[in-house]
A protein has these predicted regions:
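Exposed extracellular interaction/assembly regions and N-terminal maturation sites
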Residues: 1-10, 16-105
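Residue-level signal for pocket-adjacent positions within structured domains
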Residues: 5-8, 79, 113, 130, ...
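A structural detector for beta-sheet-dominated domains
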Residues: 13, 56, 73-75, 85-87, ...
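Extracellular disulfide-bonded cysteine-rich modules/repeats
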Residues: 21-28, 122-132, 168
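Intrinsic low-complexity, repeat-rich intrinsically disordered segments enriched
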Residues: 30, 40-54, 112-115, 134-183
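Short, surface-exposed beta-edge/turn micro-motifs
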Residues: 67-70, 90-93, 124-125, 157-158, ...
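Beta-strand-rich solenoidal segments
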Residues: 82, 90-91, 104-141
Length: 183
């Protein structure tokens, strides 16, 4: 019986197979696992098109297995709305950073499913997961300490809530302070 491969590209060796190379293949599998749970990679995005990320079976090369990594930073100057896809059937957690420049959206999705979209000014990091069909935003729950930073409420970034100083909250609409609340 010949080896088969998991969705992440791990070689699943058959009993009695790979005599003399079993150790090397196991080391490759361990490197693949490492990249899947702790790997970081930067990926240039095709401007106004689709960038398909892939996983190559039994291969630890970064450029041919970007979709395997835990943390993916999307880069490049885009001049049109762009889509980045990961293979269908992969069930995995991703931390995705939109590090692109240009006032266009970037969608991160599975090849044939749905996903999340970074707004035109949303140069942030998102925790998402693939359920094998779609990319789902993991979101967050509970209290969040903004540490005086702005909470951006819309895609173009001009509606915000800020607590710049102690005991005062500012609400900006269309970039101008419209409401202030003080204690």
């Amino acid at each position: 019986m010949a080896s088969s491969f998991s969705d992440l590209g791990l070689e699943l060796m058959a009993t009695g197979e790979n005599a003399g190379t079993w150790g090397t293949k196991t080391n490759t599998n361990l490197q693949i696992i490492e990249k899947s749970i702790a790997g970081y990679v930067e990926q240039a995005v095709t401007s106004g098109g689709t960038t398909a990320l892939s996983i190559t079976d039994g291969d630890t090369t970064e450029s041919t297995s970007v979709a395997r990594h835990a943390v993916i930073k999307l880069t490049g100057t885009i001049t049109g709305n762009s889509i980045v896809t990961v293979p269908d059937s992969i069930e995995k957690v991703y931390i995705v950073t939109n590090g692109t420049s240009g006032a266009y959206t970037v969608q991160f999705k599975t090849a044939s499913g749905t996903g999340i979209t970074f707004g035109v000014s949303e140069k942030t990091t998102r925790l998402v997961y693939s359920d094998g069909t779609n990319i789902v935003d993991a979101g967050f729950g509970g209290a969040s300490d903004m540490e005086g930073r702005e909470l951006v409420l819309d895609a173009d970034g001009d509606t915000t809530i800020t607590a710049d100083t102690d005991d005062q909250i500012d609400i900006k609409i269309a970039g101008a302070d419209d409401f202030q609340f003080t204690a």
